[in-house]
Structures are given as structure tokens and as C-alpha cells.
Amino acid sequence: MDPILLDGKKLSEKIRNEIRREIEERKTKNLRIPKLATILVGNNPASETYVSMKIKACHGVGMGSEMIRLGEQTTTEELLSVIDKLNADPNVDGILLQHPSPSQIDERAAFDRISFRKDVDGVTTLSFGKLSMGVETYLPCTPYGIVLLLKEHGINVSGKNAVVVGRSPILGKPMAMLLTEMNATVTLCHSKTQNLPEIVRLADIVVGAVGKPEFIKADWISKGAVLLDAGYNPGNVGDIEISKAKNHSSFYTPVPGGVGPMTIAVLLLQTLYSSKEHFTPPVQ
């Protein structure tokens, strides 16, 4: 069987169309439309780009959007005050603090100040804890986007060996937990993992979440593996050597156009869920 490309751009557009239809229906009934508030602290050019993409995505589906721009010298206390105001605003359904913040900001304190009911980016400690216990919550956007890609293509991970390379709290760790919820047998690898190539060769499913260009080599990949590349590095390459590895995979995500578009689609989807006062459905 020829390898099948997991087209995140196509699925992302499908999700956005569904959101757009629901918002248009709300407008015809004179109901309040969902609104996402995004906080940008400082002048990081990459963050500026990401925030612009999110605002454009909101407008594209008819969703309300508010951007709060704070200066480079903003203190943690000033940021927390802004978050408190957004928490109290009944017209704001989701709050996103763009990462990274300037070094003087206690980013964990800021994330955890976001109301659990408005944590549509799945970044609070409470959301992470509920995810680990299998309790309904809002999920980190990139891992949940990967889950939706798997489901869209009917890829059953139950009983399969999955290897996640990278253990960041917003990607690697939650990805491992979601795959566990889907009954995969998961190995979570990191910088101290020994014999990494041998571990990856045993995997039916490989998730690249390490943030290093083409770190996972093609000759580490077993025939028929599912390749899920969540990395995006200079040169339009991910964390897996996809250009070579895809030839003996069963399914693979391209870079760009695979996992990336799903992240913003999930952010919009979870903002819509929040506006309806329910959480993201279980992944099983």
C-alpha cells in the first residue's frame, strides 16, 4: 500500500467550515457569538506572526477576537490583572496567552490564572491534571489536533506501540497521555533516553515533538509505521526525516500542512465549546 498523507490543511478547513456554519446560525437567531481574547506580551516577531494567524482564523469563521498587547517591561502582576479582567468578562469565552513571554514574567503563574472554563489552549495545571486523570477538560491544541487527524483517517491505535519523542508539557506529555487514553502502549522519550533509535524502530506510531530539525532519522522507522510530525523548524522541516521516511510509512503528516493547521482549528473549536459551556469530548 502506498503511504497516505494525513492532510491537516484539508481537515482544518472542514472543522472551520463547521464552526462557521454554527456561528452563522447563531447570528440569524441574534445569539451572542463566541469570542477569543489573545494576550501578547513583548515584541517577539514569531509571536506577532502566530497571534496574527489566530486573529485571522477567528475572523475567517465569524468568531469574535480581542487582542491585548502589553509592553516588553510588563510585570507578572500587571499581566495577572489583565487576565483577571478577561476572566470576569462574560463576553469572552477563551483566553490565550501567547508563549513565550519575556523572561521577567512568571509564565506558569499567568497560565494558571486563566479561568479553567476559559482555558481553551489547555495550558493550566488544572487542565493538565484532569487530562492525566481522564476527566473531561480542554486539551492542549496540537496533541488534540493529532488525535483528530487519526480519527478522521480511521487509524486505530488501540494495542499499538507508540513512541513520543519529546516531553514538553504542552506537546509531548499530553500527547502521550491522549494516546494512552486511546489504549496505545506508549513510550515517552527525552534527552536522557538511551538507545533511542532502537526504541523508535519498535514503534507502530512515531510522534516527533522534540523541536529539532529531522532529528528522527528515516532508518529508525519501521515499515508501515504511522508518522506524526509536530515539529516545525527553519527550512520547512519537521522533527522527523519525513522526505525519506514517508516512503516506508503507512500514514504520515507533511511539514508544512500536517499538524500545524490543526492547532489553530482546535483552538477555534474549543472556544466554540466554551461558549456552549461544555468541555472537549473524550478521545476514545
From Swiss-Prot:
Known pathway: One-carbon metabolism; tetrahydrofolate interconversion
Keyword Transit peptide among UniProt keywords: no
GO CC annotation terms, alphabetical: cytosol
Binding residues for NADP(+): 166-168, 191
Pfam families tied to this protein: THF_DHG_CYH, THF_DHG_CYH_C
Family: Belongs to the tetrahydrofolate dehydrogenase/cyclohydrolase family.
Protein name as annotated: Bifunctional protein FolD
Organism: Leptospira borgpetersenii serovar Hardjo-bovis (strain JB197)
